Amino acid sequence: MLFVKYFMLFLILVASVLLGKNIARKYVNRLKELEEMRTALNIFRSKVSFTYSPIPEIFGEIAKDSKGNIGKIFSVASKKMEKVTANIAWSEAINEVDSNLNKEDKKILENLSKLLGQTDVEGQISQIDITQKFLDNQIQDAIDEKQKNEKLYSKLGITIGLAIVVVLAWNWLWWIDFVPWERDDSKNGYKFII
């Protein structure tokens, strides 16, 4: 019975540590995705400037070269462009793909869709440049949030886990198994046993 209690305490501690690490990882993943998006937009800008390839084809190439959620965004947008315009496909892809980007990040990326496929090459390059400047600000914010919150949530998970373990250990192990008290029903209380 005592082994089961120790094992449960261990599982509670591990679960709380993993929960804290998982929350902290979201800040790291957001920063990573913003940097990947900036790189993907640089590739997009270069291909629009020099190759004059159609946007669905460019997005398909970027999707193959990009990893994770950013690659999925470009892949979904490329596939959607077979049925809808580039600006609608881009906007829908950003919202459909489950990424670590927050609402403000997505809003900035959606602004790119306003001129996507609607204007000449110079207009699109200008919109990409504006989007990249806003992304740079978001990247700096993500760096600040990561530095502030990554350690906080990791340590918070450990601290909460230890607190729960201490409280449960006190109740389960100390009070029940080790305290030399015995219920004295005649006096409606407890008596100390030596």
Predicted regions and their residues:
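Juxtamembrane/interface alpha-helical elements of multi-pass membrane proteins
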Residues: 2, 8-79
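A structural signal for alpha-helical segments
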Residues: 25-32, 104, 123, 151
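Glycine- and small-hydrophobic-enriched helix-loop-helix hairpins
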Residues: 47, 52-122, 129
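Tryptophan (W) side chains
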Residues: 172-175, 181
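Short, solvent-exposed mixed-charge patches
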Residues: 193-194
